[in-house]
């Protein structure tokens, strides 16, 4: 990936709905160059898809939390399967240190978040959890 690919990805991060022609114009590249690079980035998995990113107002309507989980050594496969089936779980990361998994949750209400936390805490293999409620997003550079 070179600087042109990086610029292309940054342009898509700003507006994933931009047409190939608009991208080419804004990056001062030929339309065919942009099309070829997009196809390559999709083929090699750099671009995994195009998705909706909620605006601040819509995102603020959901309550988010980071949940740190300690789990039993052999519990990960079954636990991850249960977490995948839990719609409030947006992300799950394995980690080093005291906690084995870091989850990001989102719920419509504090009651729904509380119920989700209780459900996850009761899953087989969870030995300890710690929840951190997000109050405000100060920096968001996610692409």
Identify the meaning behind each predicted range:
Residues 1-143:
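A compositional/biophysical signature of low hydrophobicity enriched in polar/charged and small residues
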């Amino acid at each position: 990936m070179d600087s042109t690919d990086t610029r292309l990805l940054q342009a898509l991060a700003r507006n994933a709905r931009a047409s190939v022609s608009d991208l080419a114009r804004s990056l001062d590249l030929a339309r065919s160059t942009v099309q070829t690079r997009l196809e390559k980035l999709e083929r090699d998995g750099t671009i995994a898809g195009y998705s909706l990113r909620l605006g601040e107002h819509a995102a603020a309507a959901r309550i988010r939390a980071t949940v740190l989980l300690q789990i039993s050594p052999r519990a990960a496969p079954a636990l991850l399967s249960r977490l995948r089936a839990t719609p409030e779980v947006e992300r799950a990361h394995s980690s080093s240190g005291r906690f084995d998994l870091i989850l990001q949750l989102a719920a419509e209400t504090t009651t729904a978040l509380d119920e989700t936390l209780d459900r996850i805490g009761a899953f087989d293999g969870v030995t300890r959890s710690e929840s951190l409620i997000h109050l405000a997003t100060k920096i968001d550079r996610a692409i």
